[in-house]
Swiss-Prot record:
It is found in: Cell inner membrane. UDP-N-acetyl-alpha-D-glucosamine binds at residues 15-17, 127, 163, 191, 245, 264-269, 289. Belongs to the glycosyltransferase 28 family. MurG subfamily. GO terms for cellular component: plasma membrane. This is UDP-N-acetylglucosamine--N-acetylmuramyl-(pentapeptide) pyrophosphoryl-undecaprenol N-acetylglucosamine transferase.
Length: 355
């Protein structure tokens, strides 16, 4: 890169759904010669994960207000003011050319501080319905991007940046044609697991018997109980049941169909991998995960089953209906919905906003 090295400040924290897409964009721009720093909080996952990725991180003191008591609500303006002051000092010291907000509590004070310092703000909303912080920041942002249509009325749809090993998987027609034997069902509840999946899928295994084979990620601490549930269902040694899957790309490559929650990053990875899915949205009051999954259901690539209706019989009926030609057609539709160059699209908008 000729001339002055461009500087980016990424604001993202709290959960992997915010941090991992931010890391993907950061690495892409670093490979082009950009200098990148991170704004986060010291008590969330970004504090350890970001430095492991070779990126320096600065911290401000901020936390969420949802579900907090009256005293926390009353002192919120003081805490937000203090966090904005902290963020302004960091911005003035680092002097970024542009700031990228990927979500989490840190984005609010960070985005406001950048705006007050005259630094352009680019926002990326990962979910199908915008969070409170991004709805507010959208008023002062130079550019607003969204992963799924509908979060903002006029924002560009750019997808969610996903891991390169998932993007490198063979296309469904290369991967799935010629497969025989039981339908391969990958069950993912996220790294924390999902109790409804852990309770229901052993019964699905018992109902469908040799029609399916399951690879089930149960989440931290749930392995003994889920193994016992498979044992009691007469399915003890017939399926692969693990606490955590380290290589998700390998799991996607193995699978014919996925049963999972519909967090933003999960939905984007399933689409990029080209896999049919049964999505079970987390019962959040704004139905965020339902809106994430809806584009894939509308495309004929997935089925949404709300948690109260997620029974062994309902899941068994669906899986029994889906033969291999149907699954291949759904997989190809999933891949059509995917935006495989999301990282490049977000990075290009960041670069454009910095000029």
């Amino acid at each position: 890169m000729s001339g002055k090295t461009k500087r980016l400040m990424v604001m993202a924290g709290g959960t992997g759904g915010h941090v991992f897409p931010g890391l993907a964009v950061a690495h892409h721009l670093m490979a082009q010669g950009w200098q990148v720093r991170w704004l986060g909080t010291a008590d969330r996952m970004e504090a350890s994960l970001v430095p492991k990725n070779g990126i320096e991180i600065d911290f401000i003191e901020i936390s969420g207000l949802r579900g907090k008591g009256l005293m926390a609500q009353l002192t919120a303006p003081v805490r937000i003011y203090r966090a904005v002051r902290q963020a302004k000092k960091i911005m003035r010291d680092y002097q970024p050319d542009v700031v990228l907000g990927m979500g989490g509590y840190v984005s609010g004070p960070g985005g406001l501080a950048a705006w007050l310092c005259g630094i352009p703000v680019v926002l990326h909303e990962q979910n199908g319905i915008a969070g409170l912080t991004n709805r507010w920041l959208a008023r002062i942002a130079k550019k607003v991007l969204q992963a799924f249509p509908g979060a903002f009325p006029n924002a560009d749809v750019v997808g969610n940046p996903v891991r390169t090993d998932v993007l490198a998987l063979p296309l469904p027609a290369q991967r799935l044609v010629g497969r025989e034997g039981p339908i391969r069902v990958l069950v993912i509840g996220g790294s924390q697991g999902a109790r409804v999946l852990n309770q229901t899928m052993p019964q699905v295994a018992a109902t469908l018997g040799e029609q399916i084979t399951i690879w089930h990620q149960v989440g931290k601490g749930a392995l003994p109980d889920v193994l016992q549930a498979y044992q009691q269902a007469g399915q003890g040694d017939k399926h692969q049941v693990v606490e955590f899957i380290d290589d998700m790309a390998a799991a996607y490559a193995w699978a014919d169909v996925v049963v999972c929650r519909s967090g933003a990053l999960t939905v984007s990875e399933v689409a990029a991998a080209g896999l049919p899915a049964i999505f079970v949205p987390f019962q959040h009051k704004d139905r965020q995960q339902y809106w994430n999954a809806l584009p894939l259901e509308k495309a004929g690539a997935a089925k949404i089953i709300e948690q109260p209706q997620f029974t062994a019989q309902a899941v068994s009926n669906l899986l029994a209906e889906w033969d291999r030609p149907t699954l291949l057609a759904m997989a190809e539709q999933a891949r059509l919905v995917a935006i495989p160059d999301a990282t490049e699209r977000v990075a290009a908008e960041v670069a454009a906003a910095s000029k």
